Amino acid sequence: MILLQNIKRCSLKQLKVLATLLLSLSLPTLEAAENRDSDSIVWHLDYQEALQKSKEAELPLLVIFSGSDWNGPCMKIRKEVLESPEFIKRVQGKFVCVEVEYLKHRPQVENIRQQNLALKSKFKINELPCMILLSHEEREIYRIGSFGNETGSNLGDSLCHIVESDSLLRRAFPMMTSLSLSELQRYYRLAEELSHKEFLKHALELGVRSDDYFFLSEKFRLLVEVGKMDSEECQRIKKRLLNKDPKNEKQTHFTVALIEFQELAKRSRAGVRQDASQVIAPLESYISQFGQQDKDNLWRVEMMIAQFYLDSDQWHHALQHAEVAFEAAPNEVRSHISRSLEYIRHQS
């Protein structure tokens, strides 16, 4: 009131001087507020409120599930990564951030506690910390379930890259049939990074239908991985693949033999009853067909067979194949193989 009375008594010239003075006094405060905004991220506690802001701004949601008052890794990532200037600089203005806390020692508003329990169930959170990226339509883009030695800069860069890649894939999906095979392959690898299952499935179908070498290789590998190596479909894909490289110039026969051997060895370790000769049959077949022309891999294949026999306690067979490997190996690796030979001879 006193200030207003004084202002009323001022002349126009005096008012201009006073306005300048008041503005200059307020500048440091405004500047400090701007600096505070640029030095921190707003972490929303109310998920629905954050989701609404995400929809309005068409920005992705970055949700961190944490127990920051009792869980060591959560404390570490909060202090060293999420609060770091490098992380803030990279994600600020690009995400709507949500913090979902499961506290043990600090008080928490009951409706937020109940909300967080519901979110844990909704997103199937089994470990903390866990970070989920969601689109503004609440579609899950990516999930980080375990953290290693992330820094603020590399995590921030990764999150931005993931969102950008997801956007590229979303735009490419409707026009997938018009993409060249090289473009389709590039997008496929991008979809692998993001575990974009729908894109991967359709791209793989298109590539296999086009009889493309890369996609035939992928299809064969994936069928073997899910235990369908003996299926008619897998055998047809294998035949088409090998026919594309009859002379093994792309090492296709070697790769196929290795994949089949690894699958059979995995079955053996899982307790499937099969003779050792059945497990190594793909490698033996490769040696018989291409061993003489593929000297670079001959010794490697022989050592794989030797190692399998060792694991099966068949020392005599292991020794035979290790000796062949030694003879076929380049001089720089013979010393390593000779130590294995000494060990096998001693044990047998």
Swiss-Prot record:
Localization of this protein: Periplasm
SUPFAM superfamilies in UniProt: Thioredoxin-like (SSF52833)
Record bears the keyword Signal: yes
Protein name according to UniProt: Thioredoxin-related protein DsbJ
Keyword Signal attributed: yes
Record keywords: Periplasm, Signal
Signal peptide range: 1-32
InterPro entries on file: AGR/TXD (IPR051099), Thioredoxin-like_sf (IPR036249)
Pfam family, one: Thioredoxin_7
Origin species: Chlamydia pneumoniae
